């Protein structure tokens, strides 16, 4: 079976998924003011944090060429696991841009440290946008990935849904997941 052709899910599963997704959107929307408050607090506490707040809203500083790879590594551990993957992708696809997203400042710092000579040379870093439709859509429209690779099991519902809707295959790398859990995605 190819990556793009997937068996159709039963209607009951689709309905449950739709309800769960809708509840997630409502809950996330209610919590959005807290996320913005946290951003503001962190930017006051660490002024350098303010310089990259826009990335959490889906706005990237440097737009890579369309059709590249989006690889997400949450924090330090995932970044350490991702660097060999990034280097292997670079060898296999030397001209394809790779956008690496992280969620934490420590993950960002570790990525910058480990790929210091390669960042900017068709490898880009951005903070991952908050998992809300507008922010993820903005990010996807700017980065225009041909594939989304997630390190471990950092699967965000809106991101996965919008990737699927835009025809961007989602690959989970270096993860442990039961067959039952995998069916939910």
Give the predicted meaning of each segment:
Residues 2-57:
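N-terminal membrane-anchoring alpha-helices
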């Amino acid at each position: 079976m190819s990556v793009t052709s997937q068996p159709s899910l039963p209607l009951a599963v689709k309905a449950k998924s739709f309800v769960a997704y809708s509840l997630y959107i409502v809950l996330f929307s209610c919590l959005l003011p807290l996320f913005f408050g946290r951003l503001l607090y962190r930017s006051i506490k660490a002024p350098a944090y303010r310089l990259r707040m826009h990335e959490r809203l889906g706005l990237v500083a440097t737009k890579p060429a369309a059709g590249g790879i989006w690889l997400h590594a949450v924090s330090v551990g995932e970044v350490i696991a991702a660097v060999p993957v990034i280097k292997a992708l670079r060898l296999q696809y030397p001209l394809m841009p790779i956008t690496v997203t992280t969620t934490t400042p420590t993950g960002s710092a570790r990525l910058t440290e480990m790929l210091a000579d390669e960042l900017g040379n068709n490898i880009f870093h951005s903070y991952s946008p908050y998992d809300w439709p507008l922010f993820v859509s903005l990010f996807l429209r700017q980065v225009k990935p041909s594939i989304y690779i997630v390190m471990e099991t950092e699967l965000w519902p809106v991101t996965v849904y919008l990737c699927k809707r835009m025809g961007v295959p989602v690959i989970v790398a270096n993860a442990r997941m039961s067959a039952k859990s995998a069916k939910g995605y």
